[in-house]
Amino acid sequence: MADFLGMMKQAAQFQSKMKAMQDELDQIEVDGASGGGLVTVRMTAKMEVKGISIDPSLIKPDEREILEDLVVTALADARRKAEVAMQEKMQALTGGLGLPPGLGFS
């Protein structure tokens, strides 16, 4: 019975830490870039796009496809960085729990 109570307490602590981590992920912002920084995307670690910046030199009707490709690339770069930030936070949270691999927490 004591083991069960200990597990319940540990689960409650984990839930509290997860909530705190989710709040932290809202505050972490990363920048993705493409075209040598001509297009940048700012995103939270929870994958919420906060802004896109496009250098005025790229805003030409005849170069629309290039601009579209650069935006997609910058978004992908920001997403990759946001995923890394999220994984680092999750690893810090779950590192001492001894969870088996493959649960999506590490």
UniProtKB/Swiss-Prot annotation:
> Does DNA damage show up as a keyword for this record?
no
Major localization listed first in the record, in broad terms: cytoplasm
Q: Which Gene3D superfamilies match?
A: Nucleoid-associated protein YbaB-like domain
Molecular-function GO terms, alphabetical: DNA binding
Keyword Cytoplasm in annotation: yes
Q: List the subcellular locations.
A: Cytoplasm, Nucleoid
State the superkingdom. Bacteria
Q: A Pfam family name for this chain?
A: YbaB_DNA_bd
Q: Which UniProt keywords apply?
A: Cytoplasm, DNA-binding
PANTHER family (alphabetical): NUCLEOID-ASSOCIATED PROTEIN YBAB (PTHR33449:SF1)
Question: Whom does it interact with, and what assembly results?
Answer: Homodimer.
Known HAMAP family for this protein?
A: DNA_YbaB_EbfC (MF_00274)
Q: What is this protein called?
A: Nucleoid-associated protein Nwi_0368
